[in-house]
């Protein structure tokens, strides 16, 4: 499965191939600081999951190649929107589906195509950020059982972090709802070295590494008792 390669089809593989540093030729190849905000309707039901992915400086610099340096804000945003549309189309691939799953108990919750897609550039940090929202096809309540949001790239091409104090927010949640962040498992040194040895064009992971990669999911558990 080359979902992570398809995700950023603007040339990440080319970037990994031409850079000679050790970090450029090891899994993972991209680092994202993520944020999740859970959105509710007036009845207290979860209706959408908003996400922001802030990309590392190396990928941000590469993705901005070719953009006009002296363009005004409107022209620059138009170019960034084009990039965002390319990324979100790749992310919509059924095999990756935004690297995000929602579930309640043993039931997977269906979500629609990403909406409110926007790419922004922060000149202070020199990083690009992708913002999008995933609407649930049917609103759902967490009164009887928790709802879990999971974010992971099963090929470990992309590594996520949700360490910021405001990484998980519920601005429109009912007062009784609480969202808890459950971090992924920690890789042991041997597994980390095996992943680091994989080439940038590696698609499917070996079966044992694929199983381990699944344990690296970042989970947000919503409870509304």
Kindly give the residue locations of the regions a language model identified.
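Bacterial N-terminal signal peptides that target proteins for export
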Residues: 2-12
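N-terminal signal peptide c-region/cleavage motif recognized by signal peptidases
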Residues: 21-23
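Early extracytoplasmic/domain-onset interaction patches
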Residues: 29-61
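Short solvent-exposed loop/turn micro-motifs enriched in small/polar/acidic residues
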Residues: 31, 93-95, 215
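Structured domain cores in non-transmembrane regions
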Residues: 58-140
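Mature, soluble, non-transmembrane domains
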Residues: 104-225
